[in-house]
């Protein structure tokens, strides 16, 4: 499990530091609109929409923005978007998965490819790095909900697969298809989570020093700046010292 909690932490650190809140909210809005369009606009009847709203709320997205995004779907918007996954290697051979939602496949592919090239990476075919990750559900709780044993018992009862507990909190993993049921059971036992979402969890990692991490983060930042890109995941491993120096 080494590195996975650090990997999760950098995702959260990035989210908190994202100065362009409007860009972040725009990505959440798109996900909410598409989720509502693909299923029921009632989150109680649409697990994907429920998770999208929960993640948006965890980043303090205003309720009005969320409601507007759902109304867009009811009004017919969201039809044009398709979900695409790009895979490739960043600098120093780090595996990178880019999840996009776009109304222009050619534009997005061109932008993602040029961003990889510009930052010392290489965009590959779909499946070129996917084998290094597993699709999992991830539920994050603050340390304040209880000690490791308490959370482990709740996780086992809820049907989760694994738990990582540290001073910073608890990360609970489950099968991707079980996320809605597991997160609902956890909430009944532990209260509302900090975060509940589907993720690509690295099964193998690449160790990076500070210089390599800085290069990688330039690529990740550039990819995340693209309006079509929803999410970027990598399989880096780094020491606490490197993470602290970023």
Curated annotation (Swiss-Prot):
UniProt entry tagged with the keyword 4Fe-4S: no
Compartments reported by the entry: Cytoplasm
Superkingdom: Bacteria
Keywords on record: Cytoplasm, DNA-binding, Transcription, Transcription regulation
Pfam families reported in the protein's UniProt record: TACO1_YebC_N, Transcrip_reg
GO BP field: regulation of DNA-templated transcription
Recorded GO MF terms: DNA binding
Span list, region Disordered: 1-22
GO cellular component, as recorded: cytosol
This protein's record includes keyword Acetylation: no
Cross-referenced InterPro entries: Integrase-like_N, TACO1_YebC-like_2nd/3rd_dom, TACO1_YebC_N, Transcrip_reg_TACO1-like, Transcrip_reg_TACO1-like_dom3, YebC-like
SUPFAM superfamilies xref list: YebC-like
Main location: cytoplasm
Family under the similarity heading: Belongs to the TACO1 family.
PANTHER family: TRANSCRIPTIONAL REGULATORY PROTEIN YEBC-RELATED, TRANSLATIONAL ACTIVATOR OF CYTOCHROME C OXIDASE 1
Full protein name: Probable transcriptional regulatory protein SPO1072
């Amino acid at each position: 499990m080494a590195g996975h909690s650090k990997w999760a932490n950098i995702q959260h650190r990035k989210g908190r530091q994202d100065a362009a809140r409007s860009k972040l909210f725009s990505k959440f809005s798109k996900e909410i609109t598409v989720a509502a369009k693909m299923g029921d606009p009632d989150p109680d009847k649409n697990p994907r929409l429920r998770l999208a709203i929960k993640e948006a709320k965890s980043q303090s997205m205003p309720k009005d923005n969320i409601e507007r995004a759902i109304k867009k779907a009811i009004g017919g918007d969201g039809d044009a978007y398709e979900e695409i996954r790009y895979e490739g290697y960043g600098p120093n051979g780090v595996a990178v998965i880019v999840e996009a939602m776009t109304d222009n496949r050619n534009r997005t592919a061109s932008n993602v490819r040029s961003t990889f090239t510009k930052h010392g990476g290489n965009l590959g075919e779909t499946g070129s790095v996917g084998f290094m990750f597993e699709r999992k559900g991830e539920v994050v709780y603050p340390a304040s909900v209880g000690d490791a044993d308490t959370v482990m018992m709740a996780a086992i009862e809820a049907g989760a697969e694994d738990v990582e507990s540290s001073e910073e909190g608890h990360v609970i993993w489950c099968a991707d298809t079980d996320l809605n049921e597991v997160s609902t059971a956890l909430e009944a036992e532990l209260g509302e989570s900090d975060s509940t979402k589907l993720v690509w969890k690295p099964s193998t990692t690449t160790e990076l020093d500070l210089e390599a991490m800085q290069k990688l983060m330039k690529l990740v930042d550039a990819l995340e700046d693209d309006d079509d890109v929803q999410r970027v995941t990598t399989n880096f491993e780094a020491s606490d010292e490197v993470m602290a120096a970023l």
